[in-house]
A protein has these predicted regions:
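Short loop segments and helix-boundary regions at transmembrane helix junctions
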Residues: 1-52, 86-88, 146-147, 151-164
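Hydrophobic/aromatic residues within transmembrane alpha-helices
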Residues: 2, 102-103, 172
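Juxtamembrane/transmembrane-helix interface segments of polytopic membrane transporters
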Residues: 22-38, 125, 129-133, 137, ...
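Transmembrane helix-bundle core of multi-pass membrane transporters
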Residues: 22-86, 187-195, 214, 221-227
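Hydrophobic core segments of alpha-helical transmembrane domains in multi-pass membrane transport
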Residues: 22-26, 72-83, 121-129, 152-155, ...
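Helix-loop-helix "hairpin" substructures at the membrane interface of multi-pass membrane proteins
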Residues: 62-140, 163-168
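Cytosolic-side transmembrane-helix boundaries in multi-pass membrane proteins
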Residues: 98, 105, 109-112, 183-227
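Transmembrane alpha-helical segments in multi-pass inner-membrane proteins
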Residues: 136-200
C-alpha cells in the first residue's frame, strides 16, 4: 500500500517496514506470549523421509529426507516458471514490470497486478521466514533472520528474475550458510566471527561479479500513476 498506492520510495518504505517487523515481533513475543528470556522453543516440522530413496548413500539424506516445506518449495519452482513465462497472467506481470503505462492501454490494471504480485511474494517470503523457526532452528528469538532476506534479494538479482536461477542461487547461498554452521560445529581453527561473515561476504562477491550484468524489469521501483 505504501509503495503502490501512496507511491513512496520502495527502498525507504521497505527498510521502514523491515524495522517495524523487527520491533513488532520482539514486542509480540514478550507481551503476547509472556516470553522473558528472549528465546522460545516452538513446535516444529519433522523431516519427511521418502521410502527407499532416503536410504541411498550420500544423496538420499540430502534430497529425500527433508521437511515438507522443502518439497513444496522445490515443487513451486517449475510451477512458478510456467506461470510467469507460459501463461497470460505471467505475461501481464511481465508487462506491468516493464511498462505499466503501455499495459494499461491494453486493458491491464497495473495497480491490481502489482498488489497481487506483492501479496503472493510476501506470502512466500513469510513462509520462508516461518520455516527458519519451525523447520530449521526449532526456536524463536529476536533478529534470528539475521539479514537473510537481503541475501534472498541478492539471489533474485543473481537469478535475473528467473525461478530456476533463483533455485540455483538459493542452493549456493544456503550452502554457504550451512557451511558456517558446520564449520563452527566441527571446531575449525577459524574465528567464529569469520564463519558468521562468510555467507554475507559471498553474497557481496557474487553481486560484484554479476550484479551489473543482471537487468531487472524496467519499471521496478517506479510508482505508477493513472494517466
Amino acid at each position: 500500500f505504501v509503495s503502490i498506492s501512496l507511491k513512496a520510495n520502495q527502498i525507504v518504505s521497505g527498510a521502514a517496514i523491515n524495522l517495524i517487523g523487527v520491533g513488532l515481533s520482539s514486542f509480540l513475543i514478550r507481551i503476547v506470549f509472556g516470553l522473558k528470556d528472549q528465546q522460545r522453543v516452538v513446535p516444529h516440522f519433522e523431516p519427511v523421509s521418502v521410502p527407499y530413496l532416503s536410504d541411498i548413500p550420500l544423496i538420499g539424506p540430502i534430497l529425500f529426507q527433508q521437511h515438507s516445506l522443502v518439497y513444496v518449495a522445490l515443487l513451486l519452482v517449475p510451477i512458478m516458471w510456467v506461470i510467469l513465462f507460459r501463461t497470460r497472467w505471467g505475461l501481464m506481470i511481465t508487462s506491468v514490470g516493464e511498462h505499466p503505462e503501455a499495459s494499461a492501454t491494453v486493458g491491464i490494471n497495473p495497480l491490481r497486478t502489482r498488489y497481487i504480485a506483492v501479496i503472493l511474494s510476501g506470502a512466500l517470503a513469510g513462509a520462508g521466514g516461518a520455516f527458519l523457526s519451525l523447520g530449521q532452528l526449532h526456536f524463536f528469538q529476536d533478529e534470528m533472520v539475521a539479514g537473510r532476506g537481503f541475501i534472498a534479494l541478492a539471489a533474485v538479482i543473481f537469478a535475473r528474475w528467473n525461478p530456476v536461477g533463483a533455485l540455483i542461487a538459493c542452493l549456493i547461498f544456503g550452502g554457504a550458510d550451512a557451511l558456517q554452521f558446520r564449520g563452527q560445529a566441527a571446531g575449525l581453527a577459524v574465528p567464529h566471527q569469520f564463519m558468521l561473515m562468510f555467507p554475507y561476504v559471498l553474497t557481496l562477491a557474487i553481486l560484484v561479479v554479476v550484479g551489473g550484468k543482471s537487468q531487472g524489469p524496467a519499471a521496478i521501483g517506479q510508482p505508477y500513476s493513472k494517466g
